[in-house]
Amino acid sequence: MNHDINEEKTEQPTEHHIKKFRKKGETRYSRELNSLLILIFGLSNLWWSRYSIIFELKTIMFNSFNFNQNILTNQQNISLNFFFFIKKILIVFFPFFSFLICIIIIPPILFGGIKFNFTSLKLNFARLNLLHGLKKFFSFQIFIELFKTTLKLFIISCISIFYLWIYFYKILFLSTKNISSSLLDGFNVIFYCCILIILGLIPIVILDVFWRQWSYYKKLKMTHQEIKDEFKEREGSPQIKARIRQQMKINLRRRMISDVPKADVIITNPIHYAIALKYDIHKMNAPKVIAKGIGATAMKIQKIALKNGIAIIASPSLARALYRYSEIGQYIPGPLYKAVAEILAWVWKVKKWKREGGIFPEKPKNISVPSELNVTGESND
């Protein structure tokens, strides 16, 4: 039997691997979502306080352009007046920037937790490697980021130009109004333009959130070799070994159950054992066991098979032999080829019957199992 070594990251990550991954500062939180939240809440804050901001700005502008000879002849008065205006500007925008800082900090903490990553501060000469830098520069991740940035720039430009073109004359005639009306109308023009930009960016943010989730979990996945290496690294503690073994069993069982819909046939005991077989004549040298179980697991395999329209056939001695002498992901033992071939031939006849109709093919009877593989010692079913 051939055993292909597959080094693709197909295994679910262990708890230890997830912790190490998070320590590196990796997170599934979308920066695009954070930017959108900043824009939404920042604009909302400006909208709620627009009248007070406009009033204070009008006061500052009026006092700034008001000519006063006493101020000009006294240098101290000039300094005091300057700091007075600075203070007024800070008072006007302090609530806005305070709220904005909270929005910048709080969402990443809620979604990703508090992380202090000092790894990037360490001196690493490998970063000076030109080939490594070029490889990173032309990576798929960089391409995705470039595509997102270009798309955002295109959307923002189109919306801004279109909106300003529509309201061109309204903006042009702002200079003919009094200062209060001009500031308020100008604020409204900018605000509604930003609302349209937010609506245009929402699809990009949604796609980025799903992309971040998929990319994060893809990076988290491990190869068989990584799991073995981690097990060797941490095998000093019996509790950790037991926990890792348990996690590996859970991961294997989940993957096994998810593979059941791919099976061609389920061979059962009928209630104590269930073995799911798959055979691709173009890709496989022999039928392969993709799932097996006893008790509750066997019943679950049969339930999934019924739900997906997979053929189920009862052959107690063959089911016991396959369970005992076969491993998940491996080909069946050579001595069982003949027995399994009879069942697969029946499965193919059933598939043909479903397509063309006619007489339903009779199930194979007296499926023989070699005595050396017969678990209970019976010769036939």
UniProtKB/Swiss-Prot annotation:
Gene3D superfamilies: 6.10.250.2080, secretion proteins EscU. It is a multi-pass membrane protein. GO terms for cellular component: plasma membrane. Keywords: Bacterial flagellum biogenesis, Bacterial flagellum protein export, Cell membrane, Membrane, Protein transport, Transmembrane, Transmembrane helix, Transport. SUPFAM superfamilies: EscU C-terminal domain-like. Residues 1-16 have a biased composition (Basic and acidic residues). It is found in: Cell membrane. Pfam families: Bac_export_2. InterPro entries: FlhB, T3SS_substrate_exporter, T3SS_substrate_exporter_C. The chain crosses the membrane at residues 35-55, 89-109, 153-173, 187-207. The keyword Plastid does not apply. One of its GO terms (biological process) is bacterial-type flagellum assembly. Residues 1-21 are annotated as: Disordered. Belongs to the type III secretion exporter family. Required for formation of the rod structure in the basal body of the flagellar apparatus. Together with FliI and FliH, may constitute the export apparatus of flagellin. NCBIfam families: flhB (TIGR00328). This is Flagellar biosynthetic protein FlhB. It comes from Buchnera aphidicola subsp. Schizaphis graminum (strain Sg). The gene is flhB.
